[in-house]
UniProtKB/Swiss-Prot annotation:
GO molecular function, one term: small ribosomal subunit rRNA binding
Family in the record: Belongs to the bacterial ribosomal protein bS20 family.
This protein's record includes keyword rRNA-binding: yes
GO annotation (BP), single: translation
Region ranges (Disordered): 1-27
Organism lineage: Bacteria, Pseudomonadati, Pseudomonadota, Gammaproteobacteria, Vibrionales
Protein name in UniProt: Small ribosomal subunit protein bS20
Length: 86
């Protein structure tokens, strides 16, 4: 456990950041699941709409460092290919 003032402050900041990141990651996964569900249902319009929502979210998470930029690119590419195939 933190023994001095600065270490205690860093521990508090790290916990706040962890909770914030967990919330953002959960939100990202929720929108990704909505996109996957729309693709699985075969509804091209709903899938396109969900993809339009999830794309900037993935980009934002990559910019903020929650996910790697290649992971965001991979998800966007695969979603686009799956929607195109509908």
């Amino acid at each position: 456990m933190a023994n001095n003032k600065s270490a205690k402050k860093r521990a508090i900041q790290a916990e706040k950041r962890r909770q914030h990141n967990a919330s953002r990651r959960s939100m990202m996964r929720t929108y990704m699941k909505k996109t996957v569900a729309a693709i699985a249902a075969g509804d091209k319009e709903a899938a396109t709409a969900a993809f339009a929502v999830v794309t900037p979210i993935l980009d934002r998470m990559a910019t903020k460092g929650l996910i790697h930029k290649n992971k965001a690119a991979r998800h966007k590419s695969r979603f686009a290919a799956q929607i195109k195939a509908l």
